[in-house]
Amino acid sequence: DGAILFDYAQAEGMTHFGTSAKFIDAIAKIDLRPAKTHDLSSLRAMFSTGSPLVPEGFDYVYAHVKGDIQLASISGGTDIISCFVLGNPNGPGYRGEIQCAGLGMATDVFDDAGVPVRGQKGELVCTRPFPVMPIGFWNDPQGFKYRAAYFERFDNVWCHGDFAERTIHDGFIIYGRSDATLNPGGVRIGTAEIYRQVEKLEEVMEALVIGQDWPPEAPSDVRVVLFVRLRDGLVLDDALIARIKQVIRENTTPRHVPAK
């Protein structure tokens, strides 16, 4: 029951609501409208994490949860007990973007050569030490595993493993984990780019996309394979498959279209 968290928010006079992008997508799919059914007058901010919050998620929250709320998509990690990128109540917010780097975080995006880039996809990095940076791992006295985990990609630069973009607004867009990035024909594609298109469709409740080495007997490329869970009673027929592929192609590129 998606309404139960809003029941708590109303009963407790909640001011800050932490949730996930997947929860926001799920309650949008069932057309939940807390703004009409609950008293959320005390609610000042909503934080979304766990996966990228798509622009349509921003639209839904402001239309059907609360119009005068700070909606902040945030991203960091358990290992740093913090966020590299988060919200700022004093700054503008743009749909589909994370507002800014966290305090004390020299967050940036590097291309494959280790050069900072704007408006293009690359690796999310932190270029300087930060207050909550772990200094090592247990049972790793020489620090080999620690360095391999964070500093192997770029010398003396923390590479967090997120495929991201720094925008012209100094905000950030995260497209997924780097190790889950698809690479058909040598083109890097973030999984969130495909999820955003597929999950727009009313027929689709959930989706999972993978990259499969292809052909199996002598892999020379990666093919994109998409799994979908439909609303109860629906069937994945040729017409729906064609529509899914059409939506992806029209809103991204032919490279994003699943082979299967």
Please give the residue ranges for each predicted region.
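Hydrophobic beta-strand positions
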Residues: D108-V109, E165
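Short, intrinsically disordered, charge-balanced linker/junction segments flanking boundaries
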Residues: D1, K22, T253-K260
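Short coil-to-beta-strand transition motifs
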Residues: I98-G104, W158
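AMP-binding/adenylate-forming catalytic core of the ANL superfamily
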Residues: Q10, F17, F130, I135, ...
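Gly/Ser/Thr-rich phosphate-binding loop
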Residues: F6, A11-T19, A28-G93, A106, ...
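Generic beta-strand/beta-sheet core signal
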Residues: F17-S20, S48-T49, I74, C83-G87, ...
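Conserved ATP/PPi-binding loop(s) of AMP-dependent carboxylate-activating enzymes
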Residues: G102, V115-F154, I189-G190
